C-alpha cells in the first residue's frame, strides 16, 4: 500500500517542528494522518479568465475537508495573452508556462502534498499545471474557471456575436466608424471567463476532459452559470476518492500518468482536430507528453489530423458559434461521442470522472445523444444571461432545448462534418523540415493551396508596420522569423499581424509564415511553429525577399522554391558570420535576464518548446 507523502512531514518525533508549523496553519491533532490535498489556484485581477477565482479554492477546500482530507491552497501566476499582445509583454507568455509548472512542483514537493486540484483557465496556466501534474504523478483533478459569455451587440439593426478578435480587427479597419469600433470594443468581452471562442484557453480546458483529468463540462460550462459551482465541489470530492484509491487501495490506475496514456493523448488530439482547436494546443500537448514520458510526437499529430474530420466549428472560424453553443450541443462529451461512433476514439482509457475507471462509462452517462438522464440534459442546457459581470455563478439561465442537430448544428456527426479534413494540419518540406502547424478550420477553401512571394520581417513589430504601411500586397507570403522560443525569445503570438491583414482586406489574399505562434483567435492562412526555428539554423532564416513559397495543405507540404545549391550557399554565408550567425541583425529588442535564461534551454516548437534537459545533465 502506498504511504501518504505527507507522512514525511507529519510523523515521527523528528518532525515536531514541522507539525508545530502545520498546527499554526489550522491543522488539529485529529487531522494528522489525513491526506493533504494541495489546491493550486491561479486567481489574479489582471485576467478576466481568472478574476473570479478568488473564492474557488475555498469552495474546493470545503468539499475536500467534508470528505476527510486536509486542504491547503496556494497561488501561481497567470499572464493574460490578450493584454500582453502586440508589445514586449508577449515575450513572457510562453516562458510563464514553465514557471507555472515549476512553481506547482515546488509547492507540492516542498510540502509533501498527497494529491492536487488545479484551478486553471487561461492560455498558459492550464498547460503549465498539466505539465506539473504529469511530472508529479500524484492524484489530480483539473477544474477551470470556465468560458466567458459571447459578446453581443447590434450593428446596422442586426444582432451579432462578438469576441476579443472582432474588437481588434474593427479597430484597425478604416471602414468602421469610431462609434461602431467603440461599440464593438465595449461589447466584445462582457463577463468573467476565458475568451468566448475556441481559442487556446478553452481548447486546453476541453482537452483536459479528453485526457481524462477533468470532469464533463469543464471546458464548456460558462463561468457565470450557477451550475459551474458543482464542478468545483465535485473536483474536491473526486480528488479525495482518487487519493483513497491510490493510498488506501494501492490503485495506481488513478495516477495522472496512468490516465494520460498514449491512447489518451491520441484521444485529446482527435478532439483537438475535430473541434478545430487552437494551434497552440499542439505545442502544449507535446510538452505535456514529454512530462508524462509518453512518446507522442508531431508524426502522431500528423497521422491523426489526416483521418479525423472537422465536427465542430466555433469562433474564430465562424461568427455563428461560441463556447456557450458548444455546451448547448453537449460539450466535449458530445464531440467525443461522435468520434467514438466514427471509430476514432479509445474508450478503454482511464478517466477521473468514471466510477469503473473508463471513458466508455463516462460517455454512456454524459453524451447527450446516448443518455436519457434529464439531469445531464438540464446541465447542458445551461446558457448565457447577457448581463455584464465579473462574478462567478451569477445566473441560472437555460436554453429551452438542447442543440442535438448533428446534421446542421454546432456539433456534427461524421456523415455531416463541416469537412472530412480535420481542423489542424501538420505541413513539412524544405522550409520546415521538422514540421509546422496550420489551423485549417480557419482557412478559406480558396487558400488551401497558395503560391506567393516572400516578404521577410525579422520581428512582429516590423511586420505590423509593413502591413499597416502598405508594404504587403495581395499575393505576398509574409515571413516573420527569429520569433521562435529561442529567437524571440518566448515565441510571441502573431495575432496583430493576422488581424491587420484582415482589416486591410488581405485575409484571403496573403499567407503568413512564422517560427513564432498564433493566438487561438487567429484565422486565415497562418502557418506557425516552423521548425527548426531561425535561431536554431532553420531554413526559414535563409529566406530572402522575392523568393517563391508554395503551400499545399491537402498535400501537407510547404516548399521554398530555391535550389539546394543556392540554399547551401546561403547557409555557408550565414555560418560565416560567426557569433552574429542566425540572429536578427536589424532588430533592436531589450531582453531581460529571465528571458535570456529561458532562451538558453528552449527547444523548437516541434519539441513543445520545452527546456532541453540534456543541457542540464551535461
UniProtKB/Swiss-Prot annotation:
<protein>
    <recommendedName>
        <fullName>Dihydroxy-acid dehydratase</fullName>
        <ecNumber>4.2.1.9</ecNumber>
    </recommendedName>
</protein>
<dbReference type="InterPro" id="IPR000581">
    <property type="entry name" value="ILV_EDD_N"/>
</dbReference>
<feature type="binding site">
    <location>
        <position position="493"/>
    </location>
    <ligand>
        <name>Mg(2+)</name>
    </ligand>
</feature>
<keyword id="KW-0479">Metal-binding</keyword>
<feature type="binding site">
    <location>
        <position position="81"/>
    </location>
    <ligand>
        <name>Mg(2+)</name>
    </ligand>
</feature>
<comment type="function">
    <text>Functions in the biosynthesis of branched-chain amino acids. Catalyzes the dehydration of (2R,3R)-2,3-dihydroxy-3-methylpentanoate (2,3-dihydroxy-3-methylvalerate) into 2-oxo-3-methylpentanoate (2-oxo-3-methylvalerate) and of (2R)-2,3-dihydroxy-3-methylbutanoate (2,3-dihydroxyisovalerate) into 2-oxo-3-methylbutanoate (2-oxoisovalerate), the penultimate precursor to L-isoleucine and L-valine, respectively.</text>
</comment>
<dbReference type="Pfam" id="PF24877">
    <property type="entry name" value="ILV_EDD_C"/>
</dbReference>
<dbReference type="InterPro" id="IPR037237">
    <property type="entry name" value="IlvD/EDD_N"/>
</dbReference>
<keyword id="KW-0408">Iron</keyword>
<keyword id="KW-0001">2Fe-2S</keyword>
<dbReference type="GO" id="GO:0009097">
    <property type="term" value="P:isoleucine biosynthetic process"/>
</dbReference>
<dbReference type="GO" id="GO:0005829">
    <property type="term" value="C:cytosol"/>
</dbReference>
<feature type="active site" description="Proton acceptor">
    <location>
        <position position="519"/>
    </location>
</feature>
<feature type="binding site">
    <location>
        <position position="195"/>
    </location>
    <ligand>
        <name>[2Fe-2S] cluster</name>
    </ligand>
</feature>
<dbReference type="GO" id="GO:0051537">
    <property type="term" value="F:2 iron, 2 sulfur cluster binding"/>
</dbReference>
<dbReference type="GO" id="GO:0000287">
    <property type="term" value="F:magnesium ion binding"/>
</dbReference>
<keyword id="KW-0028">Amino-acid biosynthesis</keyword>
<dbReference type="InterPro" id="IPR020558">
    <property type="entry name" value="DiOHA_6PGluconate_deHydtase_CS"/>
</dbReference>
<dbReference type="InterPro" id="IPR004404">
    <property type="entry name" value="DihydroxyA_deHydtase"/>
</dbReference>
<dbReference type="Pfam" id="PF00920">
    <property type="entry name" value="ILVD_EDD_N"/>
</dbReference>
<feature type="modified residue" description="N6-carboxylysine">
    <location>
        <position position="124"/>
    </location>
</feature>
<keyword id="KW-0411">Iron-sulfur</keyword>
<keyword id="KW-0456">Lyase</keyword>
<comment type="similarity">
    <text>Belongs to the IlvD/Edd family.</text>
</comment>
<dbReference type="GO" id="GO:0009099">
    <property type="term" value="P:L-valine biosynthetic process"/>
</dbReference>
<dbReference type="InterPro" id="IPR056740">
    <property type="entry name" value="ILV_EDD_C"/>
</dbReference>
<feature type="binding site">
    <location>
        <position position="123"/>
    </location>
    <ligand>
        <name>Mg(2+)</name>
    </ligand>
</feature>
<feature type="binding site" description="via carbamate group">
    <location>
        <position position="124"/>
    </location>
    <ligand>
        <name>Mg(2+)</name>
    </ligand>
</feature>
<feature type="binding site">
    <location>
        <position position="122"/>
    </location>
    <ligand>
        <name>[2Fe-2S] cluster</name>
    </ligand>
</feature>
<comment type="subunit">
    <text>Homodimer.</text>
</comment>
<keyword id="KW-0100">Branched-chain amino acid biosynthesis</keyword>
<keyword id="KW-0460">Magnesium</keyword>
<comment type="pathway">
    <text>Amino-acid biosynthesis; L-valine biosynthesis; L-valine from pyruvate: step 3/4.</text>
</comment>
<dbReference type="InterPro" id="IPR042096">
    <property type="entry name" value="Dihydro-acid_dehy_C"/>
</dbReference>
<comment type="pathway">
    <text>Amino-acid biosynthesis; L-isoleucine biosynthesis; L-isoleucine from 2-oxobutanoate: step 3/4.</text>
</comment>
<dbReference type="GO" id="GO:0004160">
    <property type="term" value="F:dihydroxy-acid dehydratase activity"/>
</dbReference>
Amino acid at each position: 500500500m502506498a504511504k501518504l507523502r505527507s507522512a514525511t512531514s507529519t510523523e515521527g518525533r523528528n518532525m515536531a517542528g514541522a507539525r508545530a508549523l502545520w498546527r499554526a496553519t489550522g491543522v488539529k491533532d485529529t487531522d494528522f494522518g489525513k491526506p493533504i490535498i494541495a489546491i493550486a489556484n491561479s486567481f489574479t485581477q489582471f485576467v478576466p479568465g481568472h478574476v473570479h477565482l478568488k473564492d474557488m479554492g475555498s469552495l474546493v477546500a470545503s468539499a475536500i475537508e467534508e470528505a476527510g482530507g486536509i486542504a491547503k491552497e496556494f497561488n501561481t501566476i497567470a499572464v493574460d495573452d490578450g493584454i500582453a499582445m502586440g508589445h514586449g509583454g508577449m515575450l513572457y507568455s510562453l516562458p510563464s508556462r514553465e514557471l507555472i509548472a515549476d512553481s506547482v512542483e515546488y509547492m507540492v514537493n516542498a510540502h509533501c502534498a498527497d494529491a492536487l486540484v488545479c484551478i486553471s483557465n487561461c492560455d498558459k496556466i492550464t498547460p503549465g499545471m498539466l505539465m506539473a501534474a504529469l511530472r508529479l504523478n500524484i492524484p489530480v483533478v483539473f477544474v477551470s474557471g470556465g468560458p466567458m459569455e459571447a459578446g453581443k451587440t447590434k450593428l446596422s439593426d442586426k444582432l451579432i456575436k462578438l469576441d476579443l478578435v472582432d474588437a481588434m480587427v474593427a479597430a484597425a479597419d478604416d471602414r468602421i466608424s469610431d462609434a461602431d469600433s467603440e461599440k464593438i470594443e465595449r461589447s466584445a468581452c462582457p463577463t468573467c471567463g476565458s475568451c468566448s471562442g475556441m481559442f487556446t484557453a478553452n481548447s486546453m480546458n476541453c482537452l483536459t476532459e479528453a485526457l481524462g483529468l477533468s470532469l464533463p463540462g469543464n471546458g464548456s460550462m460558462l463561468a457565470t452559470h450557477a451550475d459551474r459551482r458543482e464542478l468545483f465541489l465535485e473536483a474536491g470530492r473526486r480528488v479525495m476518492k482518487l487519493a483513497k484509491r491510490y493510498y488506501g487501495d494501492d490503485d495506481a490506475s488513478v495516477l495522472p500518468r496512468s490516465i494520460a496514456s498514449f491512447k489518451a493523448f491520441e484521444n485529446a488530439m482527435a478532439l483537438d482536430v475535430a473541434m478545430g482547436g487552437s494551434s497552440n494546443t499542439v505545442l502544449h500537448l507535446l510538452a505535456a507528453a514529454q512530462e508524462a514520458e509518453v512518446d507522442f510526437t508531431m508524426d502522431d499529430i500528423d497521422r491523426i489530423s489526416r483521418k479525423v474530420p472537422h465536427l465542430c466549428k466555433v469562433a474564430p472560424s465562424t461568427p455563428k458559434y461560441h463556447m456557450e453553443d458548444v455546451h448547448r450541443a453537449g460539450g466535449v462529451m458530445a464531440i467525443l461521442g461522435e468520434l467514438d461512433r466514427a471509430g476514432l476514439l479509445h474508450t478503454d482509457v482511464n478517466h477521473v470522472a468514471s466510477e469503473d475507471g473508463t471513458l466508455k462509462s463516462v460517455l454512456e452517462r454524459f453524451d447527450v445523444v446516448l443518455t436519457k438522464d434529464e439531469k445531464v440534459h438540464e446541465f447542458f442546457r445551461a446558457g448565457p444571461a447577457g448581463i455584464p459581470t465579473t462574478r462567478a455563478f451569477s445566473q441560472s439561465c437555460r436554453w429551452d432545448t438542447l442543440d442535438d442537430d448533428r446534421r446542421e448544428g454546432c456539433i456534427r456527426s461524421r456523415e455531416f462534418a463541416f469537412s472530412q479534413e480535420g481542423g489542424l494540419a501538420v505541413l513539412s518540406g524544405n522550409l520546415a523540415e521538422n514540421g509546422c502547424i496550420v489551423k485549417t478550420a480557419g482557412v478559406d477553401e480558396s487558400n488551401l493551396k497558395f503560391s506567393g512571394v516572400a516578404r521577410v520581417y525579422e520581428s512582429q513589430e516590423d511586420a505590423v508596420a509593413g502591413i499597416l504601411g502598405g508594404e504587403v500586397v495581395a499575393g505576398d507570403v509574409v515571413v516573420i522569423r527569429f520569433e521562435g522560443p529561442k529567437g524571440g525569445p518566448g515565441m510571441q503570438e502573431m495575432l496583430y499581424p493576422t488581424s491587420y491583414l484582415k482589416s486591410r482586406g488581405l485575409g484571403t489574399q496573403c499567407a503568413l509564415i512564422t517560427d513564432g505562434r498564433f493566438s487561438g483567435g487567429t484565422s486565415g492562412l497562418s502557418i506557425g511553429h516552423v521548425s527548426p526555428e531561425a535561431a536554431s539554423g532553420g531554413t526559414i532564416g535563409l529566406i530572402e525577399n522575392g523568393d517563391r513559397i508554395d503551400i499545399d495543405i491537402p498535400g501537407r507540404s510547404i516548399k521554398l522554391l530555391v535550389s539546394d545549391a543556392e540554399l547551401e550557399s546561403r547557409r555557408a554565408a550565414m555560418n560565416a558570420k560567426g557569433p552574429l550567425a542566425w540572429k536578427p541583425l536589424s532588430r533592436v529588442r531589450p531582453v531581460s535576464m529571465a528571458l535570456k535564461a529561458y532562451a538558453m534551454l528552449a527547444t523548437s516548437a516541434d519539441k513543445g518548446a520545452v527546456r532541453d534537459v540534456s543541457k542540464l545533465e551535461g
